[in-house]
Amino acid sequence: MSVDKKPRAAHDSHDLSELLVSVRRVSKVVKGGRRFSFSVLVVVGDEKGRVGCGMGKHAEVSEAKIKAVNAAKKSMIRVYLRESRTLHHDVEAKFCASRVVLRSARVGTGIIAGGSVRAVFEVLGVQDVVAKIIGSSNPHSVIYAVFAAFKNMLSPKQVAGKRSRKVGEVIENR
């Protein structure tokens, strides 16, 4: 009996792109000396407005990366994009000593962002954005600050609801 199996390409986890943000060797001091392991930070996105970040720790880098990718897939959030290329409005957020300022940009601007913030926008699918890191540039703090900023963002529907207007009125006033 032959079973006609379809490929699992329809599953959304195969459509995700992942970028390694940082790899650190960390140690735990035990009675016999130090135990070394690797801590990996990864961002995962579908390049259509969904993004997640995750951290994994293991004695091997490859295993730590697998753990980080699984954690990132579980923590994915939706970010509303304007014209599928930039943010709807400017936003800033703080996490620990890192503060990030994210600004929407005109067509053709590109991703003007440093370090780990650039990785987030690449997997998110943003083409035009300006970002500034103020304070600590520790990749972990910066990534979590960016995600805090994403959670502070409002969709056009939410903005229209707050202003008691229609969505079309909010969008055309840009």
Swiss-Prot record:
One molecular function GO term is: rRNA binding
Q: Which GO terms describe its cellular component?
A: small ribosomal subunit
- Give me any GO biological process, just one: translation
Q: Which keywords does this chain's UniProt record carry? A: Ribonucleoprotein, Ribosomal protein, RNA-binding, rRNA-binding
- Report the superkingdom from the record: Bacteria
Q: List the disulfide bonds.
A: none
**Positions of the S5 DRBM domain:** 16-79
Q: Show the domain comment.
A: The N-terminal domain interacts with the head of the 30S subunit; the C-terminal domain interacts with the body and contacts protein S4. The interaction surface between S4 and S5 is involved in control of translational fidelity.
Please describe the quaternary structure of this protein. Answer: Part of the 30S ribosomal subunit. Contacts proteins S4 and S8.
Q: Which family does it belong to?
A: Belongs to the universal ribosomal protein uS5 family.
What task does this protein carry out?
With S4 and S12 plays an important role in translational accuracy. Located at the back of the 30S subunit body where it stabilizes the conformation of the head with respect to the body.
Protein name (record): Small ribosomal subunit protein uS5
This protein's species is: Anaplasma marginale (strain Florida)
Gene name in the database record: rpsE
